Amino acid sequence: MLKIEIVEFRRAAVLAILTGCFLFGAAALAAAANSNPTVSIAAGQVQGRLLPGGAGAVFRGLPFAQPPVGPLRWREPQPVTPWKGVRDAGESRPPCAQNSSGWNAKEAAASREDCLHLDVWMPQWPSKSPKPVMLWLHGGGNTGGAGASDPLYEGTSLISHGVVLVIADYRLGIFGFLAHPELTRESPHHSSGNYAFLDQIAALQWVHDNIAQFGGDPRNVTVFGQSAGSMDLSVLMTSPLSRGLFHRAIAESGAAGRATPLADAEQAGQRTAGTLKAPAEEALAYLRSLSTADLLRGGRGGTGAVLDGYLFDSDPSAVFAASKALPIPLLIGSNAIEMSDAGSPDALRATIQARYRDLAPKALALYGVASPGDKGSIDPVYGGPNDQWGADIGFRCPGILQGEEHAAAGFPVWEYQFDRAIPPKPNVVHSGELAYVFGNLRPTGSQAGEFGEADRKLSAAIQKYWTNFAKTGDPNGAGVPNWPKYDATSRKFMEFTRAGELAVNENQRRAFCEVFAEAEKASRANR
């Protein structure tokens, strides 16, 4: 009997210990959960995560609009439905629906239509004073890529300079840019095709309404972006719906281009609908019934602004030319080499002749392909003639012209050129500056490299310039060389050199870009 009692006692003791451990563990988990930062915003409470080492906090996967699915596919972003309780904000959400083009295979595999989310990175928790806000728009040709879920844009390094970082996703391809007469008719604004831009404005409106709860200053918002993101923010600078929502802009490798008239965009949308086998009547109901995969297989839609009389009532490039863009400071630039046309010199000559027409002889001489058999000029910074043409026509010269026209309107402009190749690559490429801007110099990932001390110093300088600009509207400040404003006489710009140094230079590709500007202005006059 005594033995049985001892055994029972031991069992009870072990059970008590296990129960105590379980309760202690549960309490510890609850305490850990409760230590995570919680914020109340317009739609409800959200709980983020503290960053290691007291580096601040991050709130991931915050919806800034209702999911644009079902009847909300191809509609303006709608306000978020409020929720009860505390919403977990510990994970970024997948990118917006897209087809794979190889470079974005990972993003395409994870993508979905329910994608209107953003991440917020805070440099302090709790916040002690309002901080400048930087909202990032990713690149990808407006057909691919990711914002918040891309580790390249991890924000710990950038926010250490005292800014709040917001990374937003927006609809892409056919989901973001399809115009169609039926969509225009159902719109209260008689508009269609600009859904991606409306998403970006909705994200900015969310920042305006909620960012103070995360320690951000809604009166000091900088939009910055690269490639398509840079083009988009430049276009937003020409929309009346953007006024008051952002106060500075950083455009990396992208400028405002031409917009498509609504009627032309609608016709393109009807062709897309036909490809998807939509009926001539009630095509919209049919298109909304299709799966995401069906739409991705059968259609692309446009990739740029539509002149709808609501979001855009004038061609964006013409708005800059008329000095009517948002009256805000602009920091703009491109990479020495962006995207190269791999064709032959003879093919390049034909391309230049078709693009520049009467101005072609001048351009052909500059690129060294004036006559059949010419191999073209090789530049130690800008590469061969195809490298030069690809960057000049697509990125560099449009950006220089946009900066010049914005400066002529009396607004402060700073221009740059980024030359540094990610080691051990031989040359800089399109998007090659991103690892430096975000301070994510890593041996793995989409911008992996064998980074050294020169790269770390260059990244630190770029981050200071970018965040100084976000704080004051001027990139200059303690610890970095003076960066002169752009002016039409000397055309000074900051060059981030191949060696990783900082150098002020003048007249960036002036002769080449003057030909571009002359051709562009003539084209505007004929539109």
Regions found by a protein language model. Name each.
Residues 14-26:
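Bacterial N-terminal signal peptides
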Residues 286-454, 465, 472:
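Substrate-gating cap/lid region and adjacent catalytic-acid/histidine neighborhood
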Residues 30-194, 444-462, 470-482, 500, ...:
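Non-catalytic accessory segments of hydrolases
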Residues 100-284, 313-343, 408-411, 503:
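Serine-hydrolase-like catalytic core of hydrolytic proteins
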Residues 1-11:
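N-terminal secretory signal peptides that target proteins for export/translocation
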Residues 219-221, 278-286, 415-417, 477-484:
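Surface-exposed patches in mature extracellular/periplasmic domains of secreted proteins
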Residues 171-174, 224-228, 417-424, 481-487:
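Short, solvent-exposed turn/loop segments enriched in Gly/Ser/Thr/Pro and often Arg
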